[in-house]
């Protein structure tokens, strides 16, 4: 039994306790279905002279088809190292599709191969990401406990960036505990924060891709230009609803 009052659940994506808490207390009632992505990351040591420290590169599209959401990032670090990442939404249609194989194919693109050829992988990893956005975010407080970070789903999906929002929820939770000594009221507190406003601005970008890559890119451009001021909020759909049958 957990005796602390309140308890902060910071398990990350799809945590065991978090899933039980969401179900038991109905924290996702009235929310859009949560959606997920799978990301791979590799740290490469490259031959001297190829890196441009501070450069960040993003791609969309190939080797993914226009119906599959995903893309890549390359962070140029110091000491002739780069961090290469590839993320695929788990709402893909083809049941035979392999995100890992797509990542390997991506590295054979002439531009990427030219960067990595002759290099060495120093470390690698994979993890799931929560992509549902603020419309899929569950209530973040319950009797005796709170959700923070990826346990709730505070990733800024278009930027593939969530450390800052996770830290923000943690700081808000700590402040709330110090000031009130309880969990109740934390959800309302966080939703009035700058981090919540940031997620609200980009809420329509990820579900907009459900209609295809090109319409999704047009929608993303609109949402960016307007600062997310569209008078509508697009709903997400469960990832498994997109999967075709064999």
Q: What do the PLM-derived regions correspond to, one by one?
A:
Residues 193-246:
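Ferredoxin-type iron-sulfur electron-transfer modules and their immediate structural context
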């Amino acid at each position: 039994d957990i005796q602390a009052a309140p308890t902060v659940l910071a398990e990350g994506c799809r945590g065991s306790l978090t899933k039980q808490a969401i179900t038991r207390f109905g924290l996702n009632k009235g929310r859009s279905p949560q959606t997920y992505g799978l990301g791979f990351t590799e740290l490469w040591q490259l031959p001297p002279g190829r890196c441009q420290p501070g450069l960040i590169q993003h791609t969309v599209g190939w080797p993914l088809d226009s119906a599959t959401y995903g893309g890549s990032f390359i962070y140029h670090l110091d000491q002739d190292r780069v961090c290469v990442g590839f993320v695929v939404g788990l709402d893909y249609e083809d049941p035979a599709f392999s995100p890992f194989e797509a990542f390997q194919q991506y590295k054979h693109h002439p531009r990427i191969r030219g960067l990595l050829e002759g290099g060495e992988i120093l470390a690698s990893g994979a993890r799931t990401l929560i992509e549902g956005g603020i419309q899929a975010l569950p209530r973040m407080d319950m009797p005796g406990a709170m959700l923070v970070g990826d346990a709730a789903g505070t990733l800024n999906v278009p930027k593939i960036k969530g450390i800052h929002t996770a830290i923000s929820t943690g700081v808000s939770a700590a402040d709330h505990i110090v000031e009130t000594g309880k969990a109740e009221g934390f959800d309302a507190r966080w939703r009035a924060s700058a981090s919540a406003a940031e997620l609200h601005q980009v809420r329509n970008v990820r579900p907009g891709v459900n209609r295809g890559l090109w319409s999704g890119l047009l929608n993303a451009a609109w949402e960016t230009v307007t600062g997310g001021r569209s008078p509508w909020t697009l709903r997400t759909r469960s990832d498994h609803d997109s999967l075709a049958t064999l």
